[in-house]
Regions:
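Class I Rossmann-like S-adenosyl-L-methionine
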Residues: 1-157
Length: 157
């Protein structure tokens, strides 16, 4: 599944930073890969899950990181999102696999210190899995939980 995770990183990068449509970017990436059916399903689940929970994943990263999101390398931010998504929402993926593969990807796509940064954030999230930080403001909490913009949530409440 190592290649599958890298395919997910590349796909999410295109979606977030090259304004690609998620379905088209995923279809293109999967067509170009030699992944088997199971790995393609894994990539799809990772990409669509990270897209769906983008705001929540970013909130978690910002809660555990001393570095602001805008200062984190684009690839490292994507690797963190995918790693956290695996830890929190993919029950069949062992935490050790999610962390170790994310660290391996961080070594490949980041600086020397990136691997330690990713390892620290993911292990901290895993340790605090049952007690993750939540926004104090009700409006922001709903926006983060469902990954909707706050202005839209304010119209519904």
């Amino acid at each position: 599944m190592a290649n599958a995770r890298e395919a997910a990183v590349k796909t999410l990068y295109k979606i977030e930073y090259e304004d690609a449509y998620s379905n088209l970017a995923l279809k293109e990436q999967l067509a170009a890969s030699d992944l088997d059916t199971r790995d393609k399903a894994f990539v799809s689940a990772l990409v669509y899950g990270a897209v769906q929970r983008k705001k929540e994943l970013e909130y978690i990263i910002s809660s555990f990181s001393k570095i602001k999101l805008k200062k984190i390398s684009k690839y490292i931010l994507i690797i963190l999102k995918l790693g956290i998504y695996q830890l929190l929402y993919m029950d069949k993926i062992p935490a050790s696999a999610a962390v170790n593969e994310s660290v391996r990807l961080a070594r490949r796509y980041g600086h020397a210190s990136s691997a330690g940064f990713v390892n620290g954030i993911l292990r901290n999230v895993d340790r605090n899995r049952g007690n993750l930080p939540k926004p104090a403001d009700r409006l922001e909490a709903i926006a983060v939980k469902y990954s909707f913009p706050e202005w839209l949530v304010s119209r519904w409440i």
